[in-house]
Amino acid sequence: MLQMKRWVGFAAAVMALLAMAATALAAEVKALDTTWQAEHETFVPWYAKQKGWDKAAGFDFKMHMFDSGMAQIEALPAKQWVVGGTGGVPMMFGALRQNAYLIAIANDESVTNAVLVRPDSPILKTKGFNPKHPEVFGSPESVKGKTILATTISSGHYAMSLWLKALGLTDKDVTIKNMDPAQCVAAFEKGIGDAVVLWAPQMYNGLKKGWKVASDVKTAGGFVPIVLIGDKDYCDKNPEEVARFLKVYFQGIDALRSEGVKLAPEYAKFLKWAGLNMSEEEAKMDLELHPVFTLQEQLKMFDASAGESQVQAWQKDLVKFFTELGKLKPAEGEKLLTGYYITDKFLKLVPTVK
């Protein structure tokens, strides 16, 4: 009986210790509200959660999903999120309206923001109208006055406007119907519009339906990054937390660089979680079409010690473009051109955090 009591006492002590450990662990893990869209850059935090990397860094990533970049920016004042991924275009408005930081680069989406047309479109009859952009389809005559379905103030909008510019046209020369990417696909499939602007992975839905690429950001002479964005107030008050978030993200980037298309099965699972169905072959293509950059590469890209950094130059091109379009007021454009919202201070902290 005495031995039994000892065992009961021992078991109770063990249970108490385990409970204390669990309580301590729970106290160490902090819910982190993050913002994303159903696309490539979001695979990293999703994969991190599957692997438990967020917990190892002291976080529980809460992934808040949005249909567009501007919807993400509009949710920032309510503090629905404090860090996450968005396009380089909505990033400008996040900086202007909410004083948000650009804290890192998620990927390069230059070839996955595209203008698509139906296979029988007269737009496809002309290729290389502008000799500077030989792979771009269309002509002023075949495009002017047409209706284009697009998500305005987005990376896709940039793709569309670059296409028009390559043809000597502007947004004013066409009719733009603003809707989110999924709505764009549904409407274009019903016969609405003459062209549709999509980014991955919705772009692949269009390609599966037989639609053809008339132009993308790269063929029209541009570059568009997906960036990691941070709420300024949160970032300034919690620099080490931001660095730990970035460390987890770079853990994912390193996996993408080392594993590449081997991650296609997991990537397809991620897309299904996000509400999109994609085959493993399509998943491989999406992985291949999204270059990512390591921490060391990004430290160089953000380095402005000898003048304008690469990231500042990329964002400056976007600012100039949207100022010329009239989407940014001249004073807003001048403010953004200084690059005040682009910072590498959190990147530099990444090697110092555990």
Annotate each PLM feature.
Residues 183-273:
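Pocket-lining segment of extracytoplasmic ligand-binding domains
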